[in-house]
Amino acid sequence: TPIQPTPVIGMVGIINDCDKAVSSGWKKINDEIWIIGSYLSEITLGASSYLEYIHGQVTGRPPEINLENEKLCQEIIRNSINKEYIVSCHDVSDGGLSLALAECSILSGLGAQINIDDNLREDKLLFGEGGSRIIFSIDINQKEGWLKYLNEFNKKIKDNLYIYKIGSVSNNKLKIKNLKKVICDLKVSTLADKFNNGIIENFKK
C-alpha cells in the first residue's frame, strides 16, 4: 500500500475540568448548528477519503494548513466550551462535512436540518476536506452570551475564519440543502445501520 499523501498527527491534552468536556453527538432538538474554520473556497478533494473510496484514487494535493488560523479556531472553540456555550463539538476531517454531520447524528440518534448557500460543486461541498474546520451546536438559550463573546474576536476572525450558522438539530433525519436544493435526505437509522454494519456487509460480498 502506498504511503497516503495526508499526514496523520496524534495529540493529547489536559482537560482542567472534565465536567465541562463535550461529546460529538447532538444534544437536543432546535439547538443551533454552526461551523467554524477554513473558507469553503479553500476546501479540496485532493488526497481526500472521497477520492480514495468512491473513485479508487489516492492522488492530489492535500489542503494547506494555516497554523495561525488553526490556533485562533481552537482558542475560540475551547473557550466557548469552557464558558458552556457549546454543547457538542466535532472536527470536520476525513470524509468532509457530510460525514461529520452524519457521525453527530449517529451518536445522538437526532437528525439535522442543514442549509448552505454556496456555488461550490456538490461533491466538494459534501466530501471536500480542509484544515481548521469544526462543527458545533449551541443551546439557543446560550446564543446571546456566545455571540457577545464571539464579538471579542471580530477583528481576528475577519478575512481569516469562516464562521456561520448552517442549521439546527431535528428529529430523525439528516437533511442537507444547498441553494435550496436538497442534496442529502436520509434517516438517522439508515446512517447508523450503514455505519455500524458496513464492515460486516463488506465481508459478505
Enumerate the predicted regions with their spans:
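Glycine-rich anion-binding loops of enzyme active sites
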Residues: 1-44, 165-168
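Glycine-/charge-enriched secondary-structure boundary and capping motifs
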Residues: 1-8, 59-62, 74, 79-205
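Gly-rich Lys/Arg/Thr-decorated short loops/hinges at beta-loop-alpha junctions or inter-strand turns
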Residues: 6, 46-64
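C-terminal transmembrane module of polytopic alpha-helical membrane proteins
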Residues: 65-72
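Glycine-/acidic-rich phosphate or pyrophosphate-binding loops and their flanking alpha/beta elements
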Residues: 17-29, 48-53, 72-80, 115, ...
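Short glycine-/acidic-enriched loop or helix-start segments at secondary-structure transitions
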Residues: 44-45, 146
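Glycine- and other small-residue-rich loops at beta-strand/loop junctions that grip anionic moieties
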Residues: 25, 66, 90
